Amino acid sequence: MTQLADLRRSYVLGSLSETDVAPDPMSQFKRWFDEAVTAKLPEPNAMTLATVDADGQPSARIVLLKGIDDRGFTFFTNYESRKGLDLAANPRAALLFHWVQLERQVRVEGRVEKVSDDESDAYFATRPLGSRVGAWASAQSREVPGRDVLEQREQEYRSKFGENPPRPPHWGGYRLVPTALEFWQGRPSRLHDRIAFRLQPGGDWQIVRLSP
């Protein structure tokens, strides 16, 4: 077995300074995200979403970013899933994007709110038919006796709704409204560049460099 202590690499692809970044973090994120898309990285919109329940127990999972604008970061899920229940109890969360091939990470922290029904309806209508049916068939995060039960539910809802399943009331979007972002660029000798944006009471963003 490979020794974990021997698994390491040097980071040499780029650098990041306070003068390099955009004056607001959303513009900087869009810049880096566009570069990840241009580099044809697999699923550049994949992000780790970390939530905390009412008892302080954290959990994390990979979800897909489905919207980005000046308001924040949008994703969609089952409101009755574990993450949905966590967010109902504690509407604060963190995101992490890791673009390995570019030697970059972006960390995001903030409060989470539900998007409007119109936004959820509009996105749901763009999903493939199987995904729309699956949103009805899966009681996400709950125990299921076997896959056959899940597939039976899928067939039942496919027969019920045909080609036009409506959006389930328990399914929709969230928006993480950021209060802090950090842009990390790998550098040699583990002296990585870390540029952080912190939202100030007046609405401006403070830009600071953090030690690696």
UniProtKB/Swiss-Prot annotation:
Catalyzed chemical reaction(s): pyridoxamine 5'-phosphate + O2 + H2O = pyridoxal 5'-phosphate + H2O2 + NH4(+); pyridoxine 5'-phosphate + O2 = pyridoxal 5'-phosphate + H2O2
Pathway named in the protein's UniProt entry: Cofactor metabolism; pyridoxal 5'-phosphate salvage; pyridoxal 5'-phosphate from pyridoxamine 5'-phosphate: step 1/1; Cofactor metabolism; pyridoxal 5'-phosphate salvage; pyridoxal 5'-phosphate from pyridoxine 5'-phosphate: step 1/1
Co-factor(s): FMN
One of the GO biological process terms: pyridoxine biosynthetic process
Highest rank taxon of the organism: Bacteria
Binding site for FMN: 61-66, 76-77, 82-83, 105, 140-141, 184, 194
InterPro entries: Pyridox_Oxase, Pyridox_Oxase_CS, Pyridox_Oxase_N, Pyridoxamine_oxidase_dimer_C, Split_barrel_FMN-bd
EC number: 1.4.3.5
Residues annotated to bind substrate: 8-11, 66, 123, 127, 131, 190-192
Keywords tagged on the record: Flavoprotein, FMN, Oxidoreductase, Pyridoxine biosynthesis
GO molecular function list: FMN binding; pyridoxamine phosphate oxidase activity
Enzyme category, top tier: oxidoreductase
Record keyword S-adenosyl-L-methionine present: no
Cofactor comment: Binds 1 FMN per subunit.
Family: Belongs to the pyridoxamine 5'-phosphate oxidase family.
General function of this protein: Catalyzes the oxidation of either pyridoxine 5'-phosphate (PNP) or pyridoxamine 5'-phosphate (PMP) into pyridoxal 5'-phosphate (PLP).
PANTHER family: PYRIDOXINE-5'-PHOSPHATE OXIDASE (PTHR10851:SF0), PYRIDOXINE-5-PHOSPHATE OXIDASE (PTHR10851)
Assembly description: Homodimer.
Protein name: Pyridoxine/pyridoxamine 5'-phosphate oxidase
Organism: Cupriavidus necator (strain ATCC 17699 / DSM 428 / KCTC 22496 / NCIMB 10442 / H16 / Stanier 337) (Ralstonia eutropha)
Gene behind the chain: pdxH
